[in-house]
Amino acid sequence: MEAMNEQDEMLVMSGKEHREVLKRMLSYTKYHIPSLIWTGVLVLLVTLADVFAPILIKIFLDDYLTPMNLEMQALLILGAGYLGLTIGKSIVWYFQLLYFQKIALEIVQQMRIDIFTKLHSLGMRYFDKTPAGSIVSRVTNDTEAVKDMFINVLSTAIQSLFMLVGIYAAMFALNVQLALYSLLLFPLIVFIIFVYRKYSSQFYRARREKLSQLNAKIAESISGMSIVQQFNQERRLVKEFEKINKDYYDVGMKNIKFNALLLGPAIDLIYALAVVIILSFFGAESLIGPVAIGTIYAFISYFDRFLEAIYNVMERLAMYQEAITAASRVFRIMDETEEVPAQLNDPEAKITRAKIEFKDVSFAYEGGRDVLKNISFTAEPGQTVALVGHTGSGKSSIINLMMRFYEFERGDILIDGKSIKSHEIAELRKKTGLVLQDSFMFYGDINTNIRLYDKNITDEQIVDAAKFVQADGFIQTLSDQYQHKVIERGASFSSGQRQLISFARTVVTNPQILVLDEATANIDTETENLIQTGLKRMREGRTTIAIAHRLSTIKDADLILVLSKGRIIERGTHDTLIAEQGVYHSMYQLQNSGMDLDAAL
């Protein structure tokens, strides 16, 4: 849905917006001015070679061939000059292309760094509403289109500009009157370029959006492959993909037909008109006196090169439109305001005792109803507060606010008496250990997945942390132990093993606040028994907020909060809640009888 809305917005991009995108793209060249100047000099040399080549042929035709004045020395000089121009042009062309490629690659490299950096500053709301495939498309495909613009469009524009100026200078030098007549074709050329630019832009915008939708569908299918196969969704997804792919094909065919209609025939028409003008002019001249054949050749050759330059510009307009469209999509991310919740960064706001207070906190996701309503509780330093409730009751939302993934609308969260908004985000994350139900693992090895590239963490600390959470036992059975390779998302490990590694990752940072999001939900009973002792030791001296699926794991919690529809409906210790024989008591009894917690509610 987001991609389609974006397409509608871009189809009405104004001229001012178009210029702003171009200006912003060109701003990336400011660090490459010396290289661009040098490349411009090389382009000028190539242009001069193209301009002087017809003059050498003209001299040969008019001064030597027509009057039959075949002086060998002069012919050798002309031949050597023409050959030298051709070889020199080829050498200079190589370096010109090399420099343009280098500049383009460096610009796109910086642009990708900028957009990747920006993505990591955005809040979770942005990722909730934007398909992952669309984001990947912008970082890869769209920046690649920008690279093509600098390599092909910018180089062609500079070269064509020099070529047009050089050609007209040579034409005026040869025959002022005919050069003036040729200017009559300019309005037609400008009109064709205007029409081509106006209509081709729509096709290229649509193509970029369809490509983004293709990437989004592919990413969705791959990330959910197990569900797709389990529920026999392959045929449905293939049909959806075929539809998007067909739309992409249809847009591409419309663009090809438009190019075939306007590029080739239009340029051929202008060339035919130019030849008619030249032949008519020299035909009239021949009635008065002799006509220089070399001059006729030079003019036709110049018009051929002139129209070739125009054709190249029009052909590159397609790339230009694609690059403008792609760049506007990239800049939309860079201009995105849905950033990580802002922090006041009060220097006096330090986490020392780790006392946590929720005061009448209410929160809603994008455009929805409140998922948390007036939540209030206090976790004293070193205490464990457990959150229980059915799916959608608001447990994970409390964790998300605690980690500052989202901004809450009303109320406040205090840590050691200071608003959570006052703490530096880096300190807050550093002193808070988070263990999720679905633990994520990166490419690399077990060592780096526990250390997370923190050079201050030693190998000894990694081993101690793994032993602390009972992960060392299974790691020692692996062939490379702590250097054992981890593939994407740790797919070669069981859920329990991934969870144990995530425990070690948290313990090794020695956090003051511990947040457990159903951390033992994916652990089998035997493994859970192994880590319960470790978790109990880990909670000692740390303020802990834990979402519990198995109520048996939170009997020793200092405070248990029972949530339903975003509200706290019961609170107390395990014993007091059991004695009250309310919702928690029913949940506990039903779960002990083997029923699921959600079924209990």
Describe each PLM feature range.
Residues 36-92, 172-177, 289-293:
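Transmembrane helix-loop-helix hairpins at lipid-water interfaces of multipass membrane proteins
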Residues 276, 342-343, 349-601:
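ABC-type nucleotide-binding domain
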Residues 10-18, 41-42, 49-62, 85-132, ...:
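Juxtamembrane helix-loop junctions of ABC transporter transmembrane domains
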Residues 1-50, 65-78, 95-100, 104, ...:
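Membrane-integrated ABC transporters
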Residues 124-125, 141-150, 154, 158, ...:
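An intracellular "coupling" helix at the cytosolic face of ABC transporter transmembrane type-1 domains
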Residues 71, 170-184, 258-328, 334:
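Helix-loop-helix
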Residues 41, 53, 59, 92, ...:
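Hydrophobic alpha-helical transmembrane segments of ABC transporter permease domains
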